Amino acid sequence: MASPEGTDGEGMGCCGWFQVEAIVERKTGDTISDDESEEENETDTDVDGFIDNTLINNTQEDRETAQQLLQVQTAHADAQTLQKLKRKYIGSPLSDISNQQTVYREEVKRRLILSEDSGYGNTLETLETSQQVEYEKGNGCGSSQNGGSQNSNCSEHSVSNMDIDTNMETPTHQLQELFKSSNVQGRLHFKFKEVYGVPYTELVRTFKSDSTCCNDWICAIFGVNETLAEALKTILKPQCVYYHMQCLTCSWGVIVMMLIRYICGKNRKTITKSLSSILNVPQEQMLIQPPKLRSPAVALYFYKTAMSNISEVYGETPEWIQRQTQLQHSLQDNQFELSKMVQWAFDNEVTDDSQIAFLYAQLADIDSNAQAFLKSNMQAKYVKDCGIMCRHYKRAQQQQMNMCQWIKHICSKVDEGGDWKPIVQFLRYQGVDFISFLSYFKLFLQGTPKHNCLVLCGPPNTGKSCFAMSLINFFQGSVISFVNSQSHFWLQPLDNAKLGLLDDATDTCWRYIDDYLRNLLDGNPISLDRKHKQLVQIKCPPVIITTNVNPMQDAKLRYLHSRISVFKFENPFPLDNNGNPVYELSNVNWKCFFERTWSRLNLDNDEDKENNGDSIPTFRCVPEQNTRLL
């Protein structure tokens, strides 16, 4: 074998090393190169070359270099650990470079579909997204030149895209996108059906006006905070007598659906403002309509869901749910009886057909017969028949009463607490002798011949019509107008009255009375023409006539002078500073007036003295039911 390079002889071990050092360093007889400094070997510091002083000077620098290296290594290790965590919890990076182009195309397609072309801003965002994807594909994610760093960049890009997609699916973002929709109500109805499984329109009836009041409402509120939804159950208790609340969660957040009955009727505006302030939800995220009260399906839905654990129920169940879900209420549903409707109209003195229909329909919640009336297809016929029968009964009852019984009957319907003095003071203010007026008024109420007509005469604005109208209103009398004198039936209202009034008679009217109505002023029986009915013979009731013309001063009306009694009202009607009458001529005061002057007007009836009970018999048109057990 060849000897090792740089050795002569067979030096081995340490001896060989020193021999090599001696040979390499310098040989005997070699010339010293000019490049070498002779002074360097001749100095006294040749011994210093054996000690390396640079190690002592550079110790601090070596330590700092080691710390920097350690920091770099630690940061690299942390980056690798973080990358592993991202791959584990977020998703693996794009490891296959050949599939990167396909993956990015799918991502771009997904992001383009998610974006809505609803404005200039959204279009720019879509273009910027596509340009950014193409730029990243050209910078390394689509090539294989960057190795591991390329995988790291692609992983970070996929993580950022995933964060964007996650943010777009939040409930707040979806509700914001809802407001951009052209049909917000449609999307709310669709979401309600998707969550609750029943269409909202099947539970409610539509109120077009926001000002219509109702006690029962069905409210659906979308995107409610969960804490506020729980607090709503406590806040609503002082405002309502019943609520049925359900809270379900979806991608939009919490959807609250409740059937609520308020203490008093409220409209949609009031409810919307109240719930919006409590739940911090805009009005566009609410559906508020009244329920279908006559739908068995709606009643059954709330009845069954109230027994489940998803509902929170407070208060007593509404009667419209009980009536349609409980057997007891189902057995109580009867057929319609016209006699009960007539009895109700007679007791409440409702004789007008429109009032009968409207007021009786409002009793459907508490009256089974009214409910059966609403279910009937012959409501118009029932209303007409009820009005006719009620008017027949009222007329027959009135004809059976004399004037004393009638005054007692109408006084029983007026409240207590009146004062008779304002009426007397007003008569004295007009210069009317109260004793003379009371004497004639007694004969006037009895219908004495030649004393059947009382005339109030005087200048305008003296209170003639006010005094007469207040008395007619108390007596529930009838008013006739001379403007209808061309008709044969203008006196027909006197057929059903205990007292009549002809207001503001002129010269022409007095000529007509002098020509055709002398018997009417006498208080004798007259023949009265009625529309669509045969002629009827009646005794004309007492009549009050107000006029600005004094018939006693007209010689052409001399045949009427013995048939009428004139009281002059010459002073202006007194008013206070607020424009109210100084002397109040109300029903309560007239009641007190008749009670005070009852004996002076000779209204005591012999039949009443014999019968200590009620002189007016109680009318009853409903057959009595036998409640005895068989």
Curated annotation (Swiss-Prot):
Bias kind Polar residues: ranges: 156-166
Region ranges (Disordered): 26-46, 136-166
Comp. bias regions, Acidic residues: 32-46
Entry comment on modification after translation: Phosphorylated. Sumoylated.
Residues given in the record as ATP binding sites: 458-465
Motif interval(s): Nuclear localization signal: 86-88
Domain (SF3 helicase) ranges: 432-582
Region DNA-binding region, annotated ranges: 167-333
A molecular function (GO) term: DNA binding
Claim: DNA-binding is one of the keywords in the record: yes
This protein's UniProt keywords: ATP-binding, DNA replication, DNA-binding, Early protein, Helicase, Host nucleus, Hydrolase, Isomerase, Isopeptide bond, Nucleotide-binding, Phosphoprotein, Ubl conjugation
Glycyl lysine isopeptide (Lys-Gly) (interchain with G-Cter in SUMO) crosslink residues: 539
Single GO BP term: DNA replication
GO cellular component: host cell nucleus
Phosphoserine: residues bearing it: 92
Complex and partners: Can form hexamers. Interacts with E2 protein; this interaction increases E1 DNA binding specificity. Interacts with host DNA polymerase subunit POLA2. Interacts with host single stranded DNA-binding protein RPA1. Interacts with host TOP1; this interaction stimulates the enzymatic activity of TOP1.
Family stated for the protein in its record: Belongs to the papillomaviridae E1 protein family.
HAMAP family attached to this UniProt entry: PPV_E1 (MF_04000)
Name of this chain's protein: Replication protein E1
Originating species: Human papillomavirus 66
